Each structure stands twice: as C-alpha cells, then as structure tokens.
Amino acid sequence: MATDAFDLKWGQELAAKIGPQIKTEISRIRKSPPLIPLVQSSARYEGVVPDYRVDPGPPARIKPSARLIPIKISSEFVLSQEQFTDEMLAAHLALRPAADLAYAEDAILLHGSRAETYLKGLNIRDENSTLGEQHGLFETAPKPLPADKSITDSIREGLEKLQKQLQHGPYCVIVSPDLHRDAITPNGTSTTPKIAPVLPELRESGFRFSEAAPQRTGVIFSIGGGALDMYIPWDVHVECRKVEGSATFVMVEQFRLRINDPRALATLS
C-alpha cells in the first residue's frame, strides 16, 4: 500500500477492525451480567438524555421534558508510521486504554462529580467537561465502616433501610476490595463465607467489588421498578482522530447513570 493511502479513512477502517477485540477486554472488566441495567441508544453522541426520575406520588409521575447531561470520556493511543500495517500490534496497544476507560467508567458510576480524584494518573479525558454534572451511587463521599462493624450486619441494615423506603429488589451490593475479601473469608474453621447468610437476599451474582471504592466502603441498591440504569448513547469504541505523521486513536464512550428513584440507594454504614 502506498504511503499516501494511510489517511483518516484508513485510520477509521483500522479502528473498526480492532473495535471488537476491545469490547472483549471491556466486558472482562465490567463483569457480566452488569449490576446496573444498561439502556443502549443509537450509537451516536447526544447532548442531553431523557431524565426518568420518578416522583413517587401517588400517583407516580415523571416530569415532562426533563433532561440530563451525559459524560463522554476517552483515552488516547498513537501508532507510529512504522506500525501502520501491524493490526495485531494496534489491537494490543489499545488494550491499556480500554482497561483505563473501564476503570474510569466504574469510578464515575460510583462517585459521579467527585470521581476526578480517582482518575488522577490515568490517561482519561473528559471531552465535554461534564464530569461536574454527573451523579454517582455514592450520594456523598462515603465513610469507612467502623472497624468493629461486620459487612454482613452492614448489608442487613442497608436492606432494612431500602425496604422501609418501599424498595422491593432485586438488591445489589458493591464494596471495596478489602471488604469483599473479608466477606468471602470463611468463619473460623468453617468453609462457609461470612457473607453467606445475606446472599439469598441479593440478586444472583449481586455482590461485587470495585477498585474505585475506598477502603471499607460500599453501597447497596435496588434495581427493581426501573430505579436506576445506565443510559449509553454510544458504547465503548475506537475512533481515529488524525493521521499526521503518526496516527492518533482514542478509546471513547458516552454514558449517563440515571438514578430514577433516589430511595433505591443506601451507602453502607
């Protein structure tokens, strides 16, 4: 292929070829099935998305024409001219930005507008500067569980709180890695993990950890009744932004956590 054929069109075609491999990497990090219901849109960027926050009434209603601002995040990677014909290398290079993007998504879903602290050191760009508009599962900065408080007791209390707020499940829990390790540790000489007594009350595979959760913190939430979802105008994909000497690509996605019923969330305490 002649050198002058390496243009933006070539870059876009290469991006389309390596995109499916990136989705595999993202799905490994996101974990399947996702805890938060996904609402996929039409693979185009949107300036605003529908706001489905419910006024419980009675009768229940949604404010007409309410809108939310999504966030568009990206992670850049570059191919030198000598690497233009090596599709395998390009796909491998894209794996690191894909991992960073998946972690950034996790941090934003948990912390919303406060996620910037957790994105430091990562090659992540808030393309439209809308991080400040985002809401997270942690309504405020979470405080660590007391040292003498068990994760099981904390989850039970969270379940009771949600049920008093007329939330009927299915229930899910996201905790910090250290709380997760403690929860799956057997009691004494038993082989039964500490978390076992409350697992029947949670959705199947509904107890998970996030590296973006600070030590000894967690959140419990109900996903029934459309209480929350993740609206995705355009899911993770690869774009070629320019070919000028080297070729610049980005891993990019646009999404919005919609908390349709704030009563469906409770920070573990």
Predicted regions: what they are:
Residues A2-I73:
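Assembly/oligomerization interface modules of large self-assembling protein complexes
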